[in-house]
Amino acid sequence: MMRPILARGAARCASQCAPLRATVPPASRVLLGTSTWRPTRQYSIKAKAAESTKPQDLDSSKLTIEKTTKPKPLKKAEELVFGQTFTDHMLSIEWNKDAGWLAPKITPYQNLSLDPASSVFHYAFECFEGMKAYKDKAGQIRLFRPDRNMERLNKSAARIALPNFNPNTLLDLIAQLVKVDSRFIPEQRGYSLYLRPTMIGTQKTLGVGAPGSALLYVIASPVGPYYPTGFKAISLEATDYAVRAWPGGVGDKKLGANYAPCIVPQREAMSRGFQQNLWLFGEEQFVTEVGTMNMFVALRNKETGAKELLTAPLDGTILEGVTRDSVLSLAREKLAPEGWSIIERKYTMQELSDAADEGRFIEAFGSGTAAIVSPVRSISWKGKLVDCGLKAHEESGELATKMKNWIEARQYGDEEHEWSYTC
């Protein structure tokens, strides 16, 4: 079915691009490496363009709840290991192309029954989210910026031909699940209930195509603080021998297929004494992400000495992190009045090395849902360690500490803010 479409597209391109080619000087066509002329990209993929149908509304009024008859004992908070303890229940919603979204169900946590030919197993039709529920001092349950997670999950699903959904309805259903399993939310500061919404293609077929059926489910896991005894700065290996994402790819979507290929490079970095990879891209060695987090660096401008908080732009090669956006918003609100410049632009590993050599490197940290922020001590690059500004006795810079405190204040309801969603 695809070949006739591609043939027609090629024919259209030939007719449409002929006038463009005719206007390009011959020298530009030959000397692309030295000419300033570049061909214009004719097409690009956007989330909405990838949707085969309009979002089909979920119906929360059809929710059924079946509670477990064998509730699990609660673990002591200090015994919690990330992602290894799960609550009593899960939310699941089936979809098929004929009926759309079926009635949502909250049931006891259980195994899935899938055909071995399900498309998720063969062609990676899978996307997910990571978000958390918290208890404030009054025992009220709160979610942190869940609308951003719903938006991103829809974008990820659309990019791999999975169905979209009404984000407000799914958020309401997730809140219902959280309330059913509220006893699993630890009350101590730094603890939370990690939520994992996941969507998979379930159609029984070995053919490569958009799945005709899918499953959206949500599981929950009580977790402790990423740094239980306080910050512990990490060391990174600048990685250019493997690529996490590339222009026109899916590095900005939260797909499982983006994560598995990163494990071997991480193991290699760990074998050399580094905790994470700092992913570089291209001959210029642009800094993109750190491990599974967005990357921030604080530098002094070489010409003016002004303080700058710098992070890579949303160019399609990095994830649209919810914590990243929160850090940027807080920085513009609280740091900009103090003279900081908050900048989203491409920057290179050479820039960071030069800043360190010249004493202009203030600090660096990663940002993500699991840790909020993760301070960076040093980066291994081209056989040398690039110092990221921390003193020997320090495990965190001033900015990373402030960001963690500012974000936690809104997560736990100490500061009433629109980012906090009460269940």
Where are these regions (language model features)?
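Non-catalytic, conformational "gating/processing" segments within enzyme and secreted inhibitor domains
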Residues: 180-183, 188-213, 224
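Helix-start/capping segments and mature chain N-termini
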Residues: 3-5, 9, 44-177, 205-423
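An exposure/low-complexity boundary signal
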Residues: 36, 40, 168, 176-187
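N-terminal mitochondrial targeting presequence
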Residues: 1-53
